Design a protein with these regions (language model features):
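Conserved acidic
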Residues: 2, 37, 159
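N-terminal Sec/SRP start-transfer signal
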Residues: 1-33
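Alpha-helical transmembrane segments
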Residues: 31-42
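Short, functional N-terminal and low-complexity linear motifs
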Residues: 10-17, 40-44, 97
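Basic-flanked hydrophobic alpha-helices used for secretion and membrane insertion
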Residues: 43-252
Length: 253
């Protein structure tokens, strides 16, 4: 009588229970497959929601309208690891719509999406949000058309400029108004984008809004607390830094 070895016992078991083992292998494979699909699906939904939020608000953690603090001072606070700059030289005279341009960091933060066209790349080019076109009664304007706008510089004298439309943007600036104690028209993000050289107007001054990414470990409430002041009577004064609350609304307190 032959001695039974482990290999022979295993082989005999496989032959006897072949269908059961095949079913077990298929079951394990399907379980792994469905779990992988579920994980990928959840990840895809998360990424899609993140992309929609970025298109609506940008990916920055905070912003500061008309920020006069220097970048060196801001970085020395230890709160930030990236700063983008949005420059406002003027508003559109008839609709009070802010006109401006981004530096590369701000453009990367804001993730502007286009219904048609692209960003301005040279002097004389302009990109306009869809809602701004409606306010200016330029609904029929498309990429390649020319528009003549009266620009009111910040604390300056009106100038008339003609541009070629190179982009029609999805709406975003209205979502970034934030809380502000100021009522000036330029205290908004631009719905009209121009090339930086077009910001060289004869009069007025430039206003700069800043966008921030927080340094590792920094939370929104910590950044807000850094700028909060309490007087002798216990009254609190909040800073001009804006973060996003749980509903993605900008707030400075």
């Amino acid at each position: 009588m032959k001695r039974l070895t482990i290999n022979r016992i295993a082989s005999a078991s496989l032959r006897t229970n072949k269908k059961s083992y095949i079913a077990l292998v298929i079951g394990i494979f399907l379980s792994i497959f469905f779990v992988s699909c579920m994980v990928l699906g959840v990840h895809g939904l998360f990424m899609a929601n993140e992309a929609r939020r970025d298109a609506r608000l940008g990916s920055q953690d905070a912003f500061w309208l008309d920020c006069e603090e220097t970048d060196d001072v801001l970085m020395a606070s230890g709160l930030y690891d990236g700063i983008g700059h949005v420059t406002i030289p003027a508003v559109h005279n008839d609709t009070s719509t802010s006109v401006g341009y981004y530096d590369d960091t701000a453009a990367a933060f804001l993730h502007r999406s286009f219904i048609e066209g692209r960003m301005p790349e040279k002097p004389g080019e302009i990109a306009i949000e869809e809602s701004a076109l409606a306010r200016m009664r330029l609904d029929n304007v498309g990429v390649g058309d020319t528009v003549t706008l009266t620009l009111t510089p910040v604390e300056g004298v009106d100038e008339v400029r003609t541009f070629t439309v190179v982009g029609i943007m999805e709406n975003q600036s209205a979502n970034m108004k934030g809380h502000s104690s100021f009522s000036e028209l330029y205290m908004e993000f631009p719905a009209i984008l121009i090339h930086p050289t077009e910001a060289e107007l004869s009069t007025g001054r430039l206003v700069q809004h800043k966008l921030f990414s927080f340094a590792p470990g920094v939370m929104g409430y910590q950044a807000l607390t850094y700028y909060t002041r309490t007087d002798a009577q216990g009254a609190q004064t909040y800073g001009n830094l804006q973060v996003f609350d749980g509903n993605d609304n900008p707030t400075n307190w």
